[in-house]
């Protein structure tokens, strides 16, 4: 049996892509607020349901961030009219979102502002190859396949909160408490969005 995607979910809606990108980054912040709340509760004794909730939230956190990067790809495809789409349809009013993937975008030429596109894609390649985005992608991919195991480090002096860790995503990555690690990824994404807006005059 062959199924076809509904046009409503196949084509890019006519909205400002930066709204969607900002919504995804705010979505990760929302998840972190609730993750931090649960971590604070864990210090008084975690329940089985709160462990499940933690996994839902951590998985959602990384899905939102990778979603933000995918939305950036949709934006650059539309903004620069990349050959990702023009090779197939030559129409820019119907952009097939499924075709807009990193493997295609990074080698595409721009119909609009090709010199600016060269600067933008070089910056996006730096982000893609960065340690932090490798970690985010790895955590997101892992979240599709398994739940996260958490390790607690409890202070023996009883002063201060426990520290909570998930497994390392990258060889050579340092261990950081989730209260430090997760906000650092949000900060990187905020920097990415701000730099792209500055670079493109958005």
Model-derived regions: residue spans:
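Acidic, Ser/Thr/Gly/Pro-rich intrinsically disordered interaction regions
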Residues: 1-37, 44-63, 71-202
């Amino acid at each position: 049996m062959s199924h076809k995607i509904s046009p409503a979910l196949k084509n890019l809606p006519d909205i400002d892509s930066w709204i969607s990108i900002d919504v995804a980054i705010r979505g990760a912040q929302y998840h972190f607020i609730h993750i931090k709340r649960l971590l604070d509760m864990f210090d008084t004794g975690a329940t089985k349901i709160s462990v499940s909730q933690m996994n839902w939230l951590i998985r959602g956190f990384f899905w939102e961030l990778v979603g933000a990067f995918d939305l950036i790809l949709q934006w650059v495809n539309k903004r620069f009219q990349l050959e990702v789409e023009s090779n197939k349809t030559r129409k820019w009013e119907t952009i097939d979102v499924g075709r807009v993937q990193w493997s295609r975008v990074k080698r595409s030429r721009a119909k609009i502002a090709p010199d600016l596109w060269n600067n933008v894609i070089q910056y996006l390649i730096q982000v893609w190859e960065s340690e932090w985005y490798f970690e985010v992608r790895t955590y997101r991919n892992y979240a599709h396949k398994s739940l996260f195991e958490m390790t607690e480090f409890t202070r023996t002096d009883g002063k201060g909160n426990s520290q909570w860790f998930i497994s390392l995503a990258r060889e050579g990555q340092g261990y950081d408490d989730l209260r430090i690690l997760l906000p650092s990824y949000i900060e990187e994404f905020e920097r990415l969005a701000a730099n792209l807006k500055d670079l493109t005059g958005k």
